[in-house]
Amino acid sequence: MSANNMSDPRRPNKVLRYKPPPSECNPALDDPTPDYMNLLGMIFSMCGLMLKLKWCAWVAVYCSFISFANSRSSEDTKQMMSSFMLSISAVVMSYLQNPQPMTPPW
């Protein structure tokens, strides 16, 4: 084992730990996808609630899932959870008002 340590070219005192650059220095790392999907989810859920369109309510649930999946863990989740609950309530209310299966929009 000591023969391996002698032939090892690495120097432990020269090892530097990687530190990612702060996001305010590089705005390209800030992905706007969760924010856009959150906004789309709220718009579609309001359309699903007000216009009683079931497909809008389901698209709102889909957008909320995408927003939650693409968000960073350090972000505040209150807005995402309110968007998710709004989309779920749009689906529930649209099926409570008209329990028949969804008809295709085309």
Swiss-Prot record:
Residues 1-29 are annotated as: Disordered. GO terms for molecular function: protein folding chaperone. Component of the PAT complex, composed of WDR83OS/Asterix and CCDC47. The PAT complex is part of the multi-pass translocon (MPT) complex, composed of three subcomplexes, the GEL complex (composed of RAB5IF/OPTI and TMCO1), the BOS complex (composed of NCLN/Nicalin, NOMO1 and TMEM147) and the PAT complex (composed of WDR83OS/Asterix and CCDC47). The MPT complex associates with the SEC61 complex. Its main location: endoplasmic reticulum. Belongs to the Asterix family. The modification N-acetylserine is found at residue 2. Residues 2-32, 71-74 are cytoplasmic. Residues 52, 96-106 are lumenal. It is a multi-pass membrane protein. Component of the multi-pass translocon (MPT) complex that mediates insertion of multi-pass membrane proteins into the lipid bilayer of membranes. The MPT complex takes over after the SEC61 complex: following membrane insertion of the first few transmembrane segments of proteins by the SEC61 complex, the MPT complex occludes the lateral gate of the SEC61 complex to promote insertion of subsequent transmembrane regions. Pfam families: ASTER (PF03669). One of its GO terms (biological process) is multi-pass transmembrane protein insertion into ER membrane. It comes from Bos taurus (Bovine). The chain crosses the membrane at residues 33-51, 53-70, 75-95. It is found in: Endoplasmic reticulum membrane. GO terms for cellular component: endoplasmic reticulum membrane; multi-pass translocon complex. This is PAT complex subunit Asterix. The keyword Acetylation applies. Keywords: Acetylation, Chaperone, Endoplasmic reticulum, Membrane, Transmembrane, Transmembrane helix.
